């Protein structure tokens, strides 16, 4: 049930050129479709190590037999985080304002295959209650080059590795609202 599809467009041994598509657009990378492709390869040919050449960069993928089931994983392209400038339009589209944001996690743009904004909301009530216009958000995403999701999070406890994070990944490019 995920809206992205991976296509293997070329292959040289364990090195494969892979392209990803949502229902409405090509996207540079999709983790779910990467795992599904690795599992399909392992089921057809046996477990192994692969390199997927993607628009986002090379992604190392492994598929192994785990007690009769195929388990797959990958190492993402090098992640990058940068400051988010001029958030007023995005916040307005989400029905949020600066007072709704969690000061422990400044607004940022993150990359691990696709650029996307990360918005941390201070309270669970605002996190559960915000809404947005999918078409207007899609237009902003197209303008800003965000081909993946807009990630909105709420951290109820300490901001730390292993902590609980509530997340909504808004994906109008994939027709998920």
Identify the residue ranges that each predicted region occupies.
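Active-site proximal loop and beta-alpha junction motif in alpha/beta enzyme cores
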Residues: 1-29, 35-177
């Amino acid at each position: 049930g995920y809206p992205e599809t991976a296509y293997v467009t070329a292959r040289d041994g364990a090195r494969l050129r892979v392209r990803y598509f949502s229902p409405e657009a090509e996207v540079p990378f999709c983790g779910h479709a990467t795992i599904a492709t690795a599992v399909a390869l392992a089921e057809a040919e046996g477990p192994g190590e692969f390199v997927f050449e993607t628009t986002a960069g090379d992604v190392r993928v492994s598929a192994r037999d785990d007690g009769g089931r195929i388990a797959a994983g990958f190492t993402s392209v090098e992640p990058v985080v940068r400051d988010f400038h001029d958030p007023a339009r995005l916040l307005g589209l989400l029905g949020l304002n600066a007072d709704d944001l969690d000061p422990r996690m400044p607004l940022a743009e993150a990359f691990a295959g696709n650029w996307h904004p990360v918005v941390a909301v201070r309270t669970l009530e605002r996190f559960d209650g915000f809404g947005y216009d999918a078409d207007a958000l899609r237009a902003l995403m197209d303008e800003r080059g965000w081909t993946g999701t807009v990630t909105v999070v709420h951290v109820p406890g300490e901001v730390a590795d292993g902590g609980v994070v509530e997340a909504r990944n808004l994906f109008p490019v994939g027709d998920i609202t």
